[in-house]
């Protein structure tokens, strides 16, 4: 694994725990925490579902790339990326060269359990959210694994934080 340069970038599907674990890691490392989805919504002045509604997924992805470019140049950060950030090669290259990339992995059933009551996830506003998560998982899991420096199972938050801290200190 490449040396940890003070930038931890978390990737994975929605519900994998990127934001929750990211906040915990930032606190433990005494770093600043950023959630790219939050930053996109703040910059746009509207929630993510509204961006999807007004601009479609492609418009959202363009905003995502612009925000990632601004965030990855900051020192000592933990960055939680949106689940689809890795869909664009430009984003994958950007995060790979900018920091240590960790794929937080969880199976679709766990992801559904974690996102079931969250209406702010535009891609899950479908008749069968589990089928949609399985479809996203099948398409994205290989990309996450190729992009990440390493993969961590996203289960118990405390244990996952400890695992990440150990991996970063190697």
Curated annotation (Swiss-Prot):
The keyword Cell membrane does not apply. InterPro entries: P-loop_NTPase (IPR027417), Shikimate/glucono_kinase (IPR031322), Shikimate_kinase/TSH1 (IPR000623), Shikimate_kinase_CS (IPR023000). It is an enzyme of class 2 (transferase). Its cofactor is Mg(2+). GO terms for molecular function: ATP binding; magnesium ion binding; shikimate kinase activity. GO terms for cellular component: cytosol. Binds 1 Mg(2+) ion per subunit. Keywords: Amino-acid biosynthesis, Aromatic amino acid biosynthesis, ATP-binding, Cytoplasm, Kinase, Magnesium, Metal-binding, Nucleotide-binding, Transferase. Pathway: Metabolic intermediate biosynthesis; chorismate biosynthesis; chorismate from D-erythrose 4-phosphate and phosphoenolpyruvate: step 5/7. It is found in: Cytoplasm. Its main location: cytoplasm. PANTHER family: SHIKIMATE KINASE, SHIKIMATE KINASE 1, CHLOROPLASTIC. Belongs to the shikimate kinase family. This is Putative shikimate kinase. The lineage of its organism: Bacteria, Pseudomonadati, Pseudomonadota, Betaproteobacteria, Neisseriales. The gene is aroK.
């Amino acid at each position: 694994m490449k040396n940890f340069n003070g930038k931890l970038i978390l990737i994975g599907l929605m519900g994998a725990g990127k934001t929750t674990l990211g906040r915990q890691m930032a606190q433990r490392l005494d770093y600043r925490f950023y959630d790219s989805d939050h930053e996109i919504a703040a910059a746009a002045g509207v929630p993510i579902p509204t961006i999807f509604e007004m601009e479609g997924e492609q418009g959202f992805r363009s905003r995502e790339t612009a925000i990632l470019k601004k965030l990855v140049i900051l020192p000592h950060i933990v960055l939680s990326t949106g689940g689809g950030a890795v869909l664009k090669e430009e984003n994958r290259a950007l995060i790979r060269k900018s920091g240590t990339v960790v794929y937080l992995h969880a199976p679709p059933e766990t992801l559904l359990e974690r996102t079931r009551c969250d209406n702010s996830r535009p891609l899950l506003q479908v008749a069968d959210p589990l089928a949609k998560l399985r479809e996203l998982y099948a398409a994205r899991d290989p990309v996450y694994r190729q992009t990440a420096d390493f993969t961590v199972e996203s289960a118990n938050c405390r244990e996952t934080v400890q695992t990440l801290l150990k991996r970063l200190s190697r």
